[in-house]
UniProtKB/Swiss-Prot annotation:
This is Sulfoacetate--CoA ligase. It comes from Cupriavidus necator (strain ATCC 17699 / DSM 428 / KCTC 22496 / NCIMB 10442 / H16 / Stanier 337) (Ralstonia eutropha). The keyword Nucleotide-binding applies. It is an enzyme of class 6 (ligase). Transmembrane segments: none annotated.
Length: 509
């Protein structure tokens, strides 16, 4: 294991960026493979200062919200980080939002200004018009290397005060697949604390460089690949979007030492027959959804890169659990041990469950959200009476302190009174050589209450039918857990984090 210096402790993004700029003004912080341009630590600090003065001149002040509707790129990172460093609240909007969600988020967030790019301008203007909002829209390119000009309405604007650690910094809306999106409000301290946790957990230092292919409008992409490198003084290689054919080329050309992916990316990389991993990549971290053990083992065997499985959520500013960096201590199938958080499992009686017993995982820690924006009732429901965040994940802890996820409480299949974790069925199907992806759901059944339907994405050129999959599941799962029906689809619906949206599948069940 490579030794690294313990990361310094900061409590605001403004302080963090200022220190790195003074320390390494000319060192590249972010490299853009699409444009070939590099953003240095010094330029990031300068741009943050310029942005703060521009916001003040435009009549915007600390704590007010600015929305960013852009794909990944240098400009996107500059606007997100610079806005938070100025003391304003940034609202990165998911590009997968449907028109009704976009309308809701722009109105609910109390946004005062929107940054977008040419391809997104029409959607933003239409959403603002339908919401009855008169908000300035600034159009820029995701990979632009200079700030867009803001409208100046105040001649003698005072400089914005530096943000305090507990000041709100990020307003990020959940995907809202089961109802109205919820705005997760995270503070300066929340974000920097978890950037520090990531750096410490993976022993990262100034020589490390991450390939960042996850969207910055998702908490994983923002905290793990944009904020953590600020903490440890490393750098980021940020293509505009993920491409299986370019993934390893970008890693090799820019000397990446670690990777940050979701299970979907691992599946695509395994399905690409031409991919070859370069030397120099120390590890790959996988997060945001459970990594099937078969894919975990296959990735390590083929590419020779160890996978660190982690787990987090928007409400915890990304990771809350991580497997150790030391390969000998990692456990395939486990989300690891608490990382920067305290965790326990609660039984049905609301009391801590013994090791090995499944219950709801709850969390406390410095990275846990301040609450949901303008939703005090929902915020109260999200916490236990003594202040533990309810994750909604079912799981258990083993005797060595490692945690395992069984599924989501809302996604649990209850067949004839028997609780069945969908993930168990998914993993059995993934052990079939022709299956690329799978997701099981429970559907209403007059006899059992619920029956099991499995949605399956087959590998290219694979030949398989219902009978073959049923025979496979009978061997792997037994008759009771074998799906009643198999439905073949081109792709599974996923949120920006890569999680399968099972409840969307239910709409088609």
């Amino acid at each position: 294991m490579n030794a690294r210096t313990e990361p310094e402790v900061f409590d605001t993004l403004a302080a963090l960026i200022a220190v790195r700029a003074a320390q390494w003004p000319d060192k590249p912080y972010l490299l853009s493979p699409d444009s070939g341009h590099a953003l240095t630590f010094g330029a990031l600090a300068t741009d943050a200062g310029t942005l703060g003065r521009s916001y003040a001149a435009a009549g915007l002040g600390s704590g007010q919200t600015v929305s960013v509707y852009l794909p990944n790129g240098e400009q996107t990172a500059r606007l997100l980080l610079g806005t938070m460093a100025c003391g304003l609240v940034v609202n990165p909007i998911n590009l997968l939002c449907q028109p009704a969600q976009l309308r809701y988020i722009l109105a609910h967030s109390d946004t005062r200004l929107v940054f977008t790019w040419p391809d997104g301008e029409a959607a933003i203007r239409e959403a603002l018009r339908e919401a009855g909002l008169d908000v300035p829209v600034l159009v820029t390119a995701p990979d632009a290397n200079s700030l867009p000009a803001l409208p100046a309405t105040h001649d003698a604007a005072s400089p914005l005060p530096p943000p305090q650690p507990d000041a709100p910094a990020l307003l990020m809306y959940t995907s809202g697949t089961t109802g109205t999106p919820k705005g997760v409000l995270l503070t300066q301290r929340n974000l920097v604390a978890n950037g520090t946790n990531v750096s410490r957990e993976h022993c990262l230092g100034p020589a490390d460089r991450v390939l960042a292919t996850l969207p910055l409008y998702h908490i994983n992409g923002l905290v793990v690949t944009a904020i953590a490198p600020l903490v440890h003084g490393g750098s980021v290689v940020m293509p505009m979007r993920f491409s299986a054919s370019a993934f390893w080329q970008d890693s090799a050309r820019h000397g990446c030492t670690w990777l940050n992916v979701v299970p979907t990316i691992i599946a695509y990389l395994l399905n690409d027959p031409h991919g070859q991993a370069p030397a120099g990549v120390r590890f790959c971290r996988s997060a945001s959804a459970a990594l099937p053990p078969e894919h975990h083992r296959a990735f390590e065997a083929r590419f020779g890169i160890g996978v660190i499985e982690t787990m987090g959520m928007t409400e915890t500013a990304a990771p809350a659990f991580s497997n150790p960096l030391d390969p000998g201590q990692r456990r395939i199938g486990s989300i690891g041990r608490p990382s920067g958080t305290r965790a326990r499992v609660l039984g049905r009686d609301g009391k801590p469950a013994p090791d090995g017993q499944v219950g709801e995982i709850v969390l406390q820690g410095e990275s846990v959200m301040a609450g949901y924006y303008k939703a005090p009732d929902i915020t109260r429901e999200a916490f236990t009476h003594d202040g533990w965040l309810r994750t909604g994940d079912l799981g258990y802890r083993d005797a060595d302190g490692y945690f395992y996820i069984s599924g989501r409480a809302k996604e649990l299949i209850i067949k004839g009174g028997e609780n069945i974790a969908p993930r168990e069925i998914d993993e059995a199907l993934l052990r079939h050589p022709g299956v690329l992806e799978a997701a099981a759901v429970g559907v209403p059944d007059p006899a059992y209450g619920q029956e099991i339907v499995a949605y399956v994405v087959m590998r290219e050129a694979a030949r398989c039918d219902d009978a073959a999959l049923r025979a496979h599941c009978l061997r792997e799962l037994g008759r009771y857990k074998t799906p009643k029906e198999f439905r073949f689809i081109a792709e599974l619906p996923r949120g920006p984090s890569g999680k399968v949206q099972r409840l969307k599948l239910l709409n088609h069940a």
